[in-house]
Amino acid sequence: MSVILTYNVNGIRAALRKDFDKWLKSTNADIVCLQEIKANPQQFDESVFTDLGYHCYWNPAENKGYSGVAILT
């Protein structure tokens, strides 16, 4: 059975400072949907997710007031 996780991170950089990556590893999720990432992939080290075995698909917000989403598979 696949484990699908959805999580509103309210800022991916802030979540990573709070050990989001360690928590994510403990979930052993197959697919992770992240909301409100509030960053572009160039603004943080994506290897934190690729090192966990995920392929990353980012759709950062282009307009002010929007936050963007990401999917990790």
Give names to the regions the model predicted.
Residues 1-69:
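N-terminal, active-site-proximal structural segment of metallo-dependent hydrolase catalytic domains
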Residues 72-73:
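Short, intrinsically disordered, charge-balanced linker/junction segments flanking boundaries
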